[in-house]
From Swiss-Prot:
Is synthesized initially as an inactive proenzyme. Formation of the active enzyme involves a self-maturation process in which the active site pyruvoyl group is generated from an internal serine residue via an autocatalytic post-translational modification. Two non-identical subunits are generated from the proenzyme in this reaction, and the pyruvate is formed at the N-terminus of the alpha chain, which is derived from the carboxyl end of the proenzyme. Heterodimer of a large membrane-associated beta subunit and a small pyruvoyl-containing alpha subunit. Pathway: Phospholipid metabolism; phosphatidylethanolamine biosynthesis; phosphatidylethanolamine from CDP-diacylglycerol: step 2/2. The lineage of its organism: Bacteria, Bacillati, Bacillota, Bacilli, Bacillales. It comes from Halalkalibacterium halodurans (strain ATCC BAA-125 / DSM 18197 / FERM 7344 / JCM 9153 / C-125) (Bacillus halodurans). The gene is psd. It is a peripheral membrane protein. This is Phosphatidylserine decarboxylase proenzyme. GO terms for molecular function: phosphatidylserine decarboxylase activity.
Length: 259
Protein backbone atom coordinates (compact mmCIF):
# COMPACT_ATOMS: atom_id res chain seq x y z
CA UNK A 1 0.00 0.00 0.00
CA UNK A 2 2.75 2.46 0.93
CA UNK A 3 4.72 1.66 -2.21
CA UNK A 4 1.61 2.31 -4.31
CA UNK A 5 1.14 5.67 -2.59
CA UNK A 6 4.77 6.70 -3.13
CA UNK A 7 4.59 5.59 -6.76
CA UNK A 8 1.57 7.84 -7.19
CA UNK A 9 3.48 10.71 -5.63
CA UNK A 10 6.55 10.47 -7.81
CA UNK A 11 5.42 8.85 -11.05
CA UNK A 12 2.13 10.70 -10.87
CA UNK A 13 -1.19 10.43 -12.60
CA UNK A 14 -1.85 12.01 -15.97
CA UNK A 15 -4.93 13.66 -14.45
CA UNK A 16 -3.96 17.34 -13.93
CA UNK A 17 -5.93 17.86 -10.71
CA UNK A 18 -4.51 14.76 -9.00
CA UNK A 19 -1.03 15.60 -10.27
CA UNK A 20 -1.26 19.11 -8.83
CA UNK A 21 -2.50 17.82 -5.48
CA UNK A 22 0.29 15.25 -5.25
CA UNK A 23 2.89 17.81 -6.26
CA UNK A 24 1.67 20.25 -3.61
CA UNK A 25 1.78 17.57 -0.93
CA UNK A 26 5.22 16.12 -1.73
CA UNK A 27 6.82 19.58 -1.78
CA UNK A 28 5.25 20.61 1.55
CA UNK A 29 6.58 20.07 5.06
CA UNK A 30 3.46 18.01 5.72
CA UNK A 31 5.07 15.18 3.76
CA UNK A 32 8.13 15.10 6.01
CA UNK A 33 6.69 12.45 8.34
CA UNK A 34 6.61 10.02 5.39
CA UNK A 35 10.36 10.26 4.74
CA UNK A 36 11.33 7.29 6.96
CA UNK A 37 8.75 5.09 5.20
CA UNK A 38 9.89 6.27 1.78
CA UNK A 39 13.50 5.47 2.65
CA UNK A 40 12.55 1.97 3.83
CA UNK A 41 10.20 1.15 0.96
CA UNK A 42 12.72 2.13 -1.71
CA UNK A 43 15.84 1.09 0.20
CA UNK A 44 17.41 4.55 -0.09
CA UNK A 45 21.09 4.53 0.86
CA UNK A 46 21.34 7.38 3.35
CA UNK A 47 25.13 7.09 3.43
CA UNK A 48 25.27 8.39 -0.14
CA UNK A 49 23.16 11.50 0.49
CA UNK A 50 25.01 14.78 0.92
CA UNK A 51 22.94 15.59 4.02
CA UNK A 52 21.57 13.34 6.78
CA UNK A 53 18.14 12.12 5.69
CA UNK A 54 16.47 13.41 8.86
CA UNK A 55 17.36 17.00 7.89
CA UNK A 56 15.27 17.03 4.69
CA UNK A 57 12.06 19.02 5.00
CA UNK A 58 9.87 17.20 2.43
CA UNK A 59 9.62 14.08 0.30
CA UNK A 60 10.58 16.22 -2.67
CA UNK A 61 13.88 17.18 -1.06
CA UNK A 62 14.75 13.52 -0.53
CA UNK A 63 13.75 12.69 -4.09
CA UNK A 64 16.01 15.41 -5.55
CA UNK A 65 18.84 14.84 -3.06
CA UNK A 66 22.45 15.43 -4.02
CA UNK A 67 25.14 12.86 -3.26
CA UNK A 68 28.41 13.02 -1.39
CA UNK A 69 31.50 13.98 -3.36
CA UNK A 70 33.07 11.08 -5.28
CA UNK A 71 30.07 8.87 -4.51
CA UNK A 72 29.71 8.18 -8.23
CA UNK A 73 33.13 7.69 -9.87
CA UNK A 74 33.17 9.03 -13.43
CA UNK A 75 34.84 6.90 -16.11
CA UNK A 76 37.35 9.40 -17.46
CA UNK A 77 38.74 7.28 -20.30
CA UNK A 78 39.18 9.66 -23.27
CA UNK A 79 36.72 7.79 -25.51
CA UNK A 80 34.19 6.73 -22.88
CA UNK A 81 30.52 7.72 -22.87
CA UNK A 82 28.95 7.47 -19.42
CA UNK A 83 25.48 7.01 -18.07
CA UNK A 84 23.90 10.42 -17.35
CA UNK A 85 21.80 9.01 -14.50
CA UNK A 86 21.28 6.25 -12.00
CA UNK A 87 18.59 4.06 -13.52
CA UNK A 88 17.71 1.12 -15.71
CA UNK A 89 19.21 1.13 -19.19
CA UNK A 90 15.93 -0.19 -20.54
CA UNK A 91 16.36 0.09 -24.32
CA UNK A 92 19.17 0.71 -26.78
CA UNK A 93 19.72 0.21 -30.47
CA UNK A 94 20.08 1.71 -33.91
CA UNK A 95 17.71 4.21 -35.46
CA UNK A 96 16.25 3.12 -38.79
CA UNK A 97 17.06 4.81 -42.08
CA UNK A 98 13.73 6.59 -41.62
CA UNK A 99 14.89 7.75 -38.16
CA UNK A 100 12.44 5.54 -36.27
CA UNK A 101 12.96 3.59 -33.07
CA UNK A 102 10.86 1.11 -31.10
CA UNK A 103 10.25 1.10 -27.34
CA UNK A 104 7.89 -1.44 -25.73
CA UNK A 105 6.51 -2.36 -29.18
CA UNK A 106 5.61 1.26 -29.94
CA UNK A 107 7.21 2.94 -32.93
CA UNK A 108 8.47 6.50 -32.46
CA UNK A 109 9.67 8.91 -35.11
CA UNK A 110 12.73 10.98 -34.36
CA UNK A 111 11.06 13.90 -36.12
CA UNK A 112 8.32 13.93 -33.48
CA UNK A 113 10.79 13.22 -30.68
CA UNK A 114 13.15 16.06 -31.60
CA UNK A 115 10.57 18.41 -33.07
CA UNK A 116 11.75 18.77 -36.67
CA UNK A 117 12.86 17.04 -39.88
CA UNK A 118 16.25 18.70 -40.16
CA UNK A 119 17.32 17.70 -36.67
CA UNK A 120 16.04 14.16 -37.23
CA UNK A 121 18.10 13.82 -40.43
CA UNK A 122 21.31 14.46 -38.52
CA UNK A 123 20.70 11.40 -36.33
CA UNK A 124 19.22 9.03 -38.92
CA UNK A 125 20.70 5.51 -38.54
CA UNK A 126 22.38 6.69 -35.35
CA UNK A 127 22.26 5.14 -31.88
CA UNK A 128 19.76 5.62 -29.06
CA UNK A 129 19.68 4.68 -25.37
CA UNK A 130 16.74 4.92 -22.97
CA UNK A 131 17.22 5.17 -19.20
CA UNK A 132 14.28 4.79 -16.83
CA UNK A 133 14.43 6.26 -13.31
CA UNK A 134 12.23 4.80 -10.58
CA UNK A 135 11.45 6.59 -7.30
CA UNK A 136 14.34 4.73 -5.67
CA UNK A 137 16.94 6.26 -7.97
CA UNK A 138 19.08 9.36 -7.58
CA UNK A 139 17.34 11.91 -9.83
CA UNK A 140 20.10 14.30 -10.84
CA UNK A 141 21.14 14.34 -14.51
CA UNK A 142 24.75 14.60 -15.68
CA UNK A 143 26.50 15.06 -19.00
CA UNK A 144 27.46 11.78 -20.72
CA UNK A 145 30.40 13.41 -22.57
CA UNK A 146 32.73 16.38 -22.62
CA UNK A 147 31.19 18.93 -24.93
CA UNK A 148 29.69 22.29 -25.74
CA UNK A 149 25.98 22.97 -25.53
CA UNK A 150 24.95 23.93 -29.07
CA UNK A 151 21.21 24.16 -28.55
CA UNK A 152 18.54 23.59 -25.92
CA UNK A 153 14.80 23.49 -26.52
CA UNK A 154 11.55 22.24 -25.02
CA UNK A 155 8.72 20.26 -26.57
CA UNK A 156 5.50 18.54 -25.55
CA UNK A 157 2.69 19.33 -23.17
CA UNK A 158 1.49 15.93 -21.96
CA UNK A 159 2.09 14.32 -18.57
CA UNK A 160 1.62 10.58 -19.07
CA UNK A 161 3.54 8.16 -16.82
CA UNK A 162 6.89 7.02 -18.25
CA UNK A 163 7.17 3.84 -16.21
CA UNK A 164 7.04 0.36 -17.76
CA UNK A 165 3.24 0.31 -18.08
CA UNK A 166 3.12 3.87 -19.36
CA UNK A 167 5.68 3.14 -22.07
CA UNK A 168 3.86 -0.03 -23.10
CA UNK A 169 0.26 1.19 -23.06
CA UNK A 170 0.45 4.98 -23.20
CA UNK A 171 0.20 6.92 -26.44
CA UNK A 172 3.88 7.48 -27.31
CA UNK A 173 4.67 9.27 -24.02
CA UNK A 174 8.36 9.72 -24.85
CA UNK A 175 7.55 11.99 -27.80
CA UNK A 176 4.41 13.65 -26.40
CA UNK A 177 5.34 14.42 -22.79
CA UNK A 178 7.00 17.66 -21.82
CA UNK A 179 10.73 17.30 -22.43
CA UNK A 180 13.89 19.37 -22.33
CA UNK A 181 16.39 18.52 -25.08
CA UNK A 182 20.05 19.51 -25.01
CA UNK A 183 22.35 19.03 -28.00
CA UNK A 184 26.03 18.65 -27.14
CA UNK A 185 28.93 18.89 -29.55
CA UNK A 186 32.05 16.92 -28.64
CA UNK A 187 35.26 16.58 -30.63
CA UNK A 188 34.13 13.10 -31.67
CA UNK A 189 30.57 13.95 -32.68
CA UNK A 190 27.22 15.26 -31.51
CA UNK A 191 24.64 13.87 -29.14
CA UNK A 192 21.26 14.86 -27.76
CA UNK A 193 20.29 14.41 -24.12
CA UNK A 194 16.48 14.23 -23.99
CA UNK A 195 15.10 14.67 -20.49
CA UNK A 196 11.49 13.48 -20.42
CA UNK A 197 9.23 14.56 -17.59
CA UNK A 198 6.08 12.98 -16.21
CA UNK A 199 4.29 16.07 -14.95
CA UNK A 200 4.89 19.55 -16.39
CA UNK A 201 7.48 22.23 -17.10
CA UNK A 202 8.47 22.30 -13.45
CA UNK A 203 9.35 18.60 -13.42
CA UNK A 204 12.69 19.20 -15.20
CA UNK A 205 15.07 21.76 -13.74
CA UNK A 206 18.27 22.69 -15.65
CA UNK A 207 21.27 23.51 -13.45
CA UNK A 208 24.25 24.02 -15.78
CA UNK A 209 25.68 27.53 -15.84
CA UNK A 210 28.03 27.55 -18.83
CA UNK A 211 28.10 26.43 -22.46
CA UNK A 212 30.86 23.87 -21.88
CA UNK A 213 30.13 20.81 -19.77
CA UNK A 214 32.49 18.13 -18.56
CA UNK A 215 31.69 14.44 -18.57
CA UNK A 216 29.82 13.70 -15.34
CA UNK A 217 28.97 17.35 -14.64
CA UNK A 218 25.45 17.95 -13.36
CA UNK A 219 23.16 19.55 -15.94
CA UNK A 220 19.77 19.25 -14.25
CA UNK A 221 17.41 17.22 -12.11
CA UNK A 222 13.96 15.69 -12.21
CA UNK A 223 11.39 16.75 -9.66
CA UNK A 224 9.16 13.78 -10.48
CA UNK A 225 9.17 10.40 -12.30
CA UNK A 226 11.19 10.48 -15.45
CA UNK A 227 13.25 9.01 -18.27
CA UNK A 228 16.33 10.13 -20.21
CA UNK A 229 17.20 9.31 -23.81
CA UNK A 230 20.53 9.76 -25.57
CA UNK A 231 20.85 10.06 -29.35
CA UNK A 232 24.15 9.84 -31.25
CA UNK A 233 25.00 10.33 -34.91
CA UNK A 234 25.50 7.38 -37.24
CA UNK A 235 28.80 5.53 -36.88
CA UNK A 236 30.12 7.56 -33.96
CA UNK A 237 29.76 5.23 -30.96
CA UNK A 238 29.90 1.61 -29.89
CA UNK A 239 27.63 0.36 -27.09
CA UNK A 240 28.95 -1.63 -24.13
CA UNK A 241 25.86 -3.51 -22.97
CA UNK A 242 23.75 -6.18 -24.63
CA UNK A 243 20.23 -5.05 -25.65
CA UNK A 244 18.52 -6.03 -22.41
CA UNK A 245 17.51 -4.10 -19.31
CA UNK A 246 20.44 -3.50 -16.97
CA UNK A 247 20.86 -1.34 -13.86
CA UNK A 248 23.51 1.37 -14.26
CA UNK A 249 24.97 4.13 -12.11
CA UNK A 250 25.70 7.69 -13.16
CA UNK A 251 29.28 7.90 -14.43
CA UNK A 252 29.43 4.24 -15.44
CA UNK A 253 30.70 3.61 -18.98
CA UNK A 254 27.90 2.62 -21.37
CA UNK A 255 29.69 3.13 -24.69
CA UNK A 256 32.73 4.46 -26.52
CA UNK A 257 33.41 7.00 -29.23
CA UNK A 258 34.73 5.39 -32.42
CA UNK A 259 36.46 8.51 -33.72
Amino acid sequence: MRKTFFRLCFELSSHPVLSSMLQAFTTSKASRWLIPSFVRVYNINGQEAEKPLHTYQSLQEVFTRTLTENCRPIDLSPKSIVSPVDGVLAEQGTLSDEANFVVKNQTYTLEEMLGGKEKAKLYREGTYLLFYLSPSHYHRIHSPVNGTIKEQWTLGNKSAPVNNLGLRYGKRPLSRNYRLLTELEAEEGRCIVAKIGALNVNSIVPTHQSEHVDKGEEIGYFAFGSSVMLFFEKGTIQLDHQPRAVEVKMGEKVGSWLR
